[in-house]
Regions:
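Short, low-complexity patches enriched in S/T/P/G
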Residues: 1-9
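Non-catalytic, solvent-exposed segments at the cell envelope interface
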Residues: 9-12, 16, 23-343
Length: 343
């Protein structure tokens, strides 16, 4: 009898121990499951936070330092190309023109402000040497204007220039581009109804009527000479021509604003007029919105990044060409002012 009681007691202890082990196992399993759920929840929160940050902020990076700026800013690149290439050819024989004129429009619709950044075409920077197929991994330190040489179509050349400008400015997000051959400035001037400028220096070598101090409404042919003339004009430097291009752009925008007061469709009409000779990924509606915004917004001015002009042989053709060197400090200072970046 006692033997049976001992066996029962042992069985009871074993059963009780089994129940304890089972409860412990279930608790441990619960903690693990809870931990997985908690980890998943944390991961979702991090991903949501990252997505929200992307919506609120854009970023650029210079060296090891990262800067953030508000996503309220929109940035568009406007290009004016020369006639040095062979852009009417098929992909195999295509050679892009060089970019004579590069201007970024920086717009903040929320704050109702805009600013422009004019870039020197001779700025030395990293260029992607893409091939006729639009592909390529090699890069070279060359003038910014040469980015438009590469590619197999005008679209690819424009996109390569966008990439070069973006890299120059720390990976800046560029929301769209508009490219126009400078040969069509006469047509653009005509579409605006003529642009009025005051001649700041003696430009009679371009046109006898372009005397210093004279205020004239440029004819279509005069407009072309005014923005394109370089060799034998003033000091022959691109920086002097940039000043005239800047002056013409300011006067052109003023003319468009004036015309829009009478006809709000002016910007779209000009866009449509130039559609067959331009290359862009910006719609007519967006262009109209941009110019409408600029019509009423505060103009913060036209910025330039200071640098040093030299000559060099980076084009590897045995000849010396103009080269313009920026400093990282100069770039960062200008970009911080443009996008109101505070540390």
């Amino acid at each position: 009898m006692r033997r049976k009681e001992k066996i029962k007691a042992l069985l009871w202890v074993a059963g009780f121990a089994g129940i304890i082990c089972l409860i412990y196992f279930m608790l441990q399993k619960g903690e693990q499951t809870f931990g997985v759920a908690k980890d998943t929840e944390d991961q979702v929160q991090v991903e949501t936070s990252d997505e929200l940050e992307k919506l609120l902020w854009k970023s650029i990076k210079f060296g090891k330092k990262k800067y953030q700026y508000s996503s309220d800013y929109e940035t568009y690149l406007f290009l004016g190309t020369d006639g040095s290439g062979h852009e009417s050819a098929n992909r195999e024989e295509y050679v892009g023109n060089m970019a004579d004129f590069l201007m970024l429009a920086v717009i903040n619709r929320k704050e109702q402000t805009y600013a422009l950044l004019q870039l020197n075409r001779d700025t030395m920077t990293e260029i992607d040497l893409i091939g006729k197929d639009g592909e390529g991994m090699a890069t070279a330190n060359m003038q910014l204007c040469t980015a438009h040489w590469y590619g197999g179509t005008e679209k690819e050349s424009s996109e390569n220039t966008v990439n070069a400008v973006s890299k120059l400015l720390g990976g800046l997000t560029i929301d769209g581009y508009y490219t126009l051959n400078m040969e069509n400035i006469s047509r653009l001037n005509h579409a605006a109804g003529g642009v009025t400028v005051t001649i700041k220096n003696d430009l009679t070598s371009l046109d006898p009527s372009m005397k210093q101090g004279e205020t004239i409404t440029l004819t279509d042919e005069q407009a072309y000479r005014f923005v394109r003339g370089r060799m034998g004009v003033e000091d022959g430097e691109n920086t002097s021509r940039m000043e005239r291009q800047k002056q013409y752009l300011e006067a052109f925008l003023a003319k468009i604003k004036e015309n829009m007061q009478e006809d709000p469709q002016t910007a779209l009409d000009v866009y449509d007029e130039m559609a067959d000779v331009s290359v862009t990924n910006i719609s007519g509606g967006t262009i109209t919105d941009i110019l409408t915004e600029m019509h009423t917004a505060e103009n913060r001015g036209i910025f330039q990044i200071e640098g040093e002009s030299r000559t060099g042989k980076h084009l590897d053709d045995g000849l010396e060409h103009a080269e313009f060197y920026l400093t990282e400090k100069g770039i960062v200072t200008t970009v911080k002012m443009l996008y109101n970046i505070k540390e």
